Amino acid sequence: MDIQMANNFTPPSATPQGNDCDLYAHHSTARIVMPLHYSLVFIIGLVGNLLALVVIVQNRKKINSTTLYSTNLVISDILFTTALPTRIAYYAMGFDWRIGDALCRITALVFYINTYAGVNFMTCLSIDRFIAVVHPLRYNKIKRIEHAKGVCIFVWILVFAQTLPLLINPMSKQEAERITCMEYPNFEETKSLPWILLGACFIGYVLPLIIILICYSQICCKLFRTAKQNPLTEKSGVNKKALNTIILIIVVFVLCFTPYHVAIIQHMIKKLRFSNFLECSQRHSFQISLHFTVCLMNFNCCMDPFIYFFACKGYKRKVMRMLKRQVSVSISSAVKSAPEENSREMTETQMMIHSKSSNGK
């Protein structure tokens, strides 16, 4: 996507940090690619997360700590998908926001809530799997669930504390040919922005990644030790399930979140080194990389149901049962409606024949 965007625009030429620098010169390509991408994210994310939520609600009496963290991931993603139609319209219009600054702030709030709630709950899932495998006797099931409830509340409070200030500052900006919303250039005048973003990247990405990797390495060590001591444990499948969950979380985390945060860190270091004076071509390249990496990061919304699929016991069986039930209901409805339609057609035909014969008399 980024290569395609890069090949379909003429690099803008202007003085560094100049007002003549068009950072949205790639809008003709972006207005096609980005709405298609986000439409796909909207459909897959909404259907997948709603399906997961239905399964959770139907089995709420059997909830455990893993299910609880996964539930919060699902709720965060459903909230995010509700804001996508406005973003799709924004990108389709070539980065032009025409529905007011208030709605721009709200969509920005939802976007950042989803991003960092997702990161935090993925971290919680990794820690939960770590406790279940490495220290299974330290916390019993009841204590773990009660502890998980408190952690979930704390995570939401933390995320809202980080994102609510977005409602205070304007998120839209009048450009020469458009009104932009939630774009990086809208924040460039913020004092100490590079340090703020570097700090946010450390807290919201680097630290969770370190925790996830530590949990993963400890779980691997534990599984290998257990397999050596008792080969029968491999047949139970419990350790394999825990390993699959952690591997999936790491893959999703790295693929979705790493490119965006690396792009931010790299650009902020450049700004600090060159005292905020960057060439227009450098700023434009960064803007394109942001649009691409944000698309990749938001695809996380579609991957979270798969995390739930692997992490939660019996989810696959319950989903397949629901789908089979739905198909059988559809087939039975079609079978029942067929005789009714045939009898209705026969009645109408008989009435027409009777009417014609009466007219003939």
Curated annotation (Swiss-Prot):
Q: Does the keyword Phosphoprotein apply?
A: yes
Q: What is the effect of changing residue 287 to A?
A: 10-fold reduction in receptor activation
Give residues where Phosphoserine occurs.
328
State where the protein is found.
Answer: Cell membrane
Renumbered to this chain, region (Interaction with G proteins) spans 126-134
What's its membrane topology?
Answer: Multi-pass membrane protein
- Tell me what this protein is called: G-protein coupled receptor 183
**What gene, per UniProt, encodes this protein?**
GPR183
